[in-house]
């Protein structure tokens, strides 16, 4: 999620958010000591940002590719193994590639629309200029929902992930599995709720930081955590697969066989196909982050050349992101084809031994999630300001809103911790509108053509199919929650 345009940068995955702000030199949150308000519309920079010159940096294809790739990468990359069991490994990879193509198509539509707004660099302003204030309000409402959902999802993930780190690092002999540890200690109210209260208090302090550039280090933690964990999964998947073949696989029992190409399970009563597609929509959600990245090209190149370079960067980023997703899908699936965990970093170690490298990964990911959370809160607050307070928030309101928001999200996360369901809700009810519908509508409206032309109707029909798939995934998830 990009904080540079006062919106958000999706995830799940905000490790480089503050870096985008620093590189593109866009406006920041300014505390006005005279009227004790935060004015998000001020253009000048204060001492906390220490500006030296107002020269926009010249974007490169390599830099833009890296930034777009990093926007898409996050902990969702480790959630695909469980879907491979129902989809079939091959078909899940096919679906991933299809979503990647959709991702490239809709991003380029947003870029073309943005190229026609010379004085606008952020999602909200572009939306208002092309489609009016009402659509900007609609967009900001979706951004608010997105930020809330991501904060709750990450808080819900931190608790069991950190618990697995504690269990595997210090209690492995006494409690061989996390379930044993959770039943005996970690899941007890006297541990769980103080943990959430303390964690949320620290989060509130981070969210009240005036200069978000001070959180730049979270970018390196986030990128390092994902790369390290992916590397561990890649290196170890062979030994885990050999263990599975030796101890679990039974030639006569097909239920123990890996599911390579059978997609029937995804279409059974729980309709896991739609939930899996909604998860993929979330994994590729990066569209609001493209506008500040494209701004670097727009400032320094002609319109045609800037669009061409951004399209090329998007293509490279999509290919790289998809390659990393496929590697994660294959390696995570091979780690445990029979009973995969919701996240591969939840996996049980072989022979109940101590997997030191995965223990480190769990600690690393937990830290990255915590320091990434402000990247979802800042755009939430700014979207609230855009919609309800004309871009200004008093200091007292800021403090109260921060604590209330964080603790409400933590309270929900403490009782509802189904990570894959969070991703289905985000992808099914929010991402399809923010990442698919609105960019395509911006493009079609910027063309000054009738929407009834056959090629425009074809694009709208394609988006409609994606929305139906996403919403169905969200509805199926609700039904599962009600049943369970």
Task: Label the model's feature ranges.
Residues 75, 100-109, 199-208:
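Central hydrophobic cores of alpha-helical transmembrane segments in multi-pass inner-membrane proteins
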Residues 56-57, 62, 108, 114, ...:
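Membrane-interfacial loop- and helix-cap regions that link adjacent transmembrane helices
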Residues 81-87, 200-222, 411-422:
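Membrane-water interface regions at transmembrane-helix termini and the short interhelical loops
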Residues 98-106, 226, 431-438:
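Alpha-helical transmembrane segments and their membrane-interface exit regions
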Residues 2-79, 103-108:
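Membrane-interface "cap" regions at the ends of multi-pass membrane proteins
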Residues 81-113, 120:
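Extracellular loop-to-transmembrane helix junctions
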């Amino acid at each position: 999620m990009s904080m540079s345009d006062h919106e958000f940068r999706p995830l799940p995955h905000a490790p480089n958010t503050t870096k985008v702000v620093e590189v593109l030199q866009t406006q920041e949150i300014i505390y006005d000591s005279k009227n004790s308000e935060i004015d998000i519309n001020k253009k000048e920079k204060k001492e906390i940002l220490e500006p030296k010159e107002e020269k926009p940096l010249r974007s490169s294809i390599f830099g833009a590719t890296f930034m777009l790739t990093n926007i898409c990468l996050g902990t969702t990359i480790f959630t695909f193994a469980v879907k491979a069991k129902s989809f079939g490994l091959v078909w899940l990879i096919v679906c991933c590639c299809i979503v990647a193509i959709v991702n490239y198509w809709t991003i380029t539509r947003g870029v073309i629309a943005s190229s026609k707004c010379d004085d606008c660099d952020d999602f909200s302003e572009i939306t208002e200029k092309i489609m009016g204030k009402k659509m900007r309000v609609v967009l900001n409402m979706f951004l608010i929902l997105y930020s809330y959902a991501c904060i709750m999802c990450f808080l819900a993930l931190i608790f069991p992930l950190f618990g697995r780190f504690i269990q595997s690092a210090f209690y492995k002999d006494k409690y061989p599995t996390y379930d044993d540890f959770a039943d005996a200690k970690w899941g007890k109210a006297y541990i769980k709720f103080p943990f959430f209260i303390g964690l949320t208090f620290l989060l509130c302090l981070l969210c009240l930081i005036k200069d978000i550039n001070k959180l730049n280090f979270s970018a390196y933690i986030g990128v390092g955590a994902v790369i390290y964990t992916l590397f561990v999964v890649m290196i170890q998947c062979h030994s885990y697969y050999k263990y599975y073949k030796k101890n679990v696989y039974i030639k006569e029992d097909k239920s123990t066989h890996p599911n390579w190409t059978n997609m029937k399970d995804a279409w059974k009563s729980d309709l896991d196909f739609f939930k899996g597609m909604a998860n993929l929509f979330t994994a590729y959600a990066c569209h609001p982050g493209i506008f500040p990245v494209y701004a670097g090209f727009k400032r320094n190149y002609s319109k045609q050349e800037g669009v061409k370079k951004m399209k090329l960067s998007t293509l490279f980023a999509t290919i790289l992101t998809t390659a990393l997703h496929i590697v994660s899908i294959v390696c995570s699936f091979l780690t445990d084809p029979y009973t995969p965990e919701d996240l591969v970093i939840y996996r049980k170690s072989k022979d109940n031994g101590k997997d030191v490298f995965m223990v480190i990964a769990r600690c690393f990911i937990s830290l990255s999630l915590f320091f990434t959370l402000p990247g979802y809160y800042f755009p939430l607050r700014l979207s609230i300001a855009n919609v309800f307070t004309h871009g200004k928030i008093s200091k007292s309101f800021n403090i109260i809103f921060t604590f209330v928001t964080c603790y409400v999200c933590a309270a929900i996360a403490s009782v509802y911790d189904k990570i894959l369901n969070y991703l289905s809700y985000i992808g099914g009810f929010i991402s399809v509108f923010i990442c698919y519908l609105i960019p395509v509508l911006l493009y079609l409206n910027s063309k000054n053509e009738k929407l009834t032309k056959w090629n425009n109707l074809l694009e709208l029909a394609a988006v409609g199919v994606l929305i139906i798939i996403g919403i169905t995934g969200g509805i199926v998830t609700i039904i599962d929650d009600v049943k369970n």
